[in-house]
């Protein structure tokens, strides 16, 4: 009897000082799409207001807290402990990937070091996260996209503010299609999605208000779509509209005598 395929084993390390407890449900739902969260640890000083919100949901998600008291101002013991644990877990050889939950660029080198070892890194942080950390991850998910449906008008307004307009996605989608160099311009949407993830680790249709890439592509109105029966959806860039013919102003007839000067007097 063939053995059952094992899900990728993941180590989830959360920086409580730079991640809101509101994302917890969405975070672990997203991680479940990647693999099994075998290790779940959170680092912070749970006596302060920022980290205290996590204390109420630790048991719900089986997260092991690593309490770090702030003995000295300006020194982040939580970050140091997280990095030490990450390296210990990496060298154990037991994990297929790491999920680093933080908006702090201090973890850029950690992410790069883990990937140098041939292990995937999935980052989770706010849209303000510096590009250096986002690009150090194989994939980066904005935590604004993990929040539950807004419960209040204020939450809805905040969510709306974090969304980017659909047209903002057009340039990078066009770039991917161009790079794929299809003879007739048509490319499979699924392949476009994979190439987008390779080109920009933080690309996510949810950032533009859509759960599916296909819905985002339709909304931009910048691509032709082929949904022929029995085949995967394909797209290509709409050809540029031809410029309207230039109107030429009719020439006015020359006035009598204008060309030859004044007529001689009789």
Where are these regions (language model features)?
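Acidic beta-strand-to-loop metal/phosphate-binding motif
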Residues: 13, 43, 96-103, 110, ...
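Short, glycine/polar-rich helix-capping loops at beta-to-alpha or helix-loop-helix junctions
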Residues: 50-55, 125-134
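Conserved phosphate-handling catalytic cores of large alpha/beta enzymes
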Residues: 122, 134-151
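P-loop/Walker A NTP-binding module and the surrounding RecA-like catalytic core of P-loop NTPases
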Residues: 16, 21, 40, 108-112, ...
